Amino acid sequence: KNKCNYIFFFDRAQADYYLADGVTGARHLALAADPDVFAGVKTGTYDCDVAFLGQLYKSEYQDLCRGLSLYSRGYLEGIIAAQSQINGGYIIDEMLTADTLRLVNSDFLKASKGRFSVTGRELSYTLAKETTGRQRYTALALLSDRCNVNVYSNDTDGRLEKASFCGYVDYYDKMPAVFRSSKINLNISLCTIQTGIPLRVLDIMACGGFVLTNMQPELMEYFIPGEDVAVYEDMKDMIAKVQFYLEHEELRKRIAHNGYLKVCEMFRFDDRIKYMLEIADEK
């Protein structure tokens, strides 16, 4: 809370949270991407219908559940189920009341003989990872039953028998080729990102790739769904849009190109740094 410091958050909801908590230097600033950095990378042999690049988020949730009563476990499952229905919002913190945390920690302390407990923030993030992991698994399972899906990650999941696990790809050397070669690049945001535009979305666009993403409120401040980005509302809508865009190549290419132009125009590092310096000069 030092007044000399400025902290920039790409998620407006987080910036507002810290401002309300007395961090006067908290500011909102959307992320940036540099298409020039990716321009020299040649398109490789990464062709597929749908590509997903990222973690599968295998959380510590299942391990934690071993120390919980059936009641506590059921309550946390209810929180995960409720969060899974929310697109573009985060309700886990609101549902993790002080009474809930006391109940959970009572179970943990009993199971560990007084040696283990969790903070509200630790439990919230664990539930967020579990929720996102389940969403990503469900999406990949549903899509791999219908089309060719490549997963680029250090993580694997034996349940996804029809998906192709392609391992890690380097951010600068291989990632741009993946985004350009894949017909559809799928983004499923970590649900703790409440309003902001994830870097993955901007990177895909900066590479000239087509992105299908869950809805993020700040995305709508810059992009128009169906013109320079594709947005799904839920799993059913995601499947429908994947099938639609796989059948409409020219539209897919036009949206990808429009997204690329928008990133070039509105998400430059120079503009972000200029804004940061202007904020610093206010004092």
Region locations from a protein language model:
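Short aromatic-enriched loop/helix-cap "lid" or pocket-rim segments at secondary-structure transitions
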Residues: A39-K42, Y61-C65, K162-A163
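Catalytic binding pocket for nucleotide-activated donors in carbohydrate/polymer assembly enzymes
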Residues: R12, D16-L29, D34, E130, ...
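A short, aliphatic-rich alpha-helical micro-motif
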Residues: K1-N2, F179
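Nucleotide-sugar donor phosphate/pyrophosphate-binding loop at the beta->alpha transition
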Residues: K1, F9, A32-V37, T119-G133
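Short, surface-exposed amphipathic charged segments that create phosphate/polyanion-binding patches used
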Residues: N2, G40-D49, S164-G167, Y245-L246
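Short active-site oxyanion
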Residues: N2-Y6, D228
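Donor nucleotide-sugar binding/catalytic pocket of nucleotide-sugar-dependent glycosyltransferases
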Residues: N5-A15, V23-V37, D47, F52-K58
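Extended, charge-rich helix/loop segments that form flexible
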Residues: K58-N148, Y152
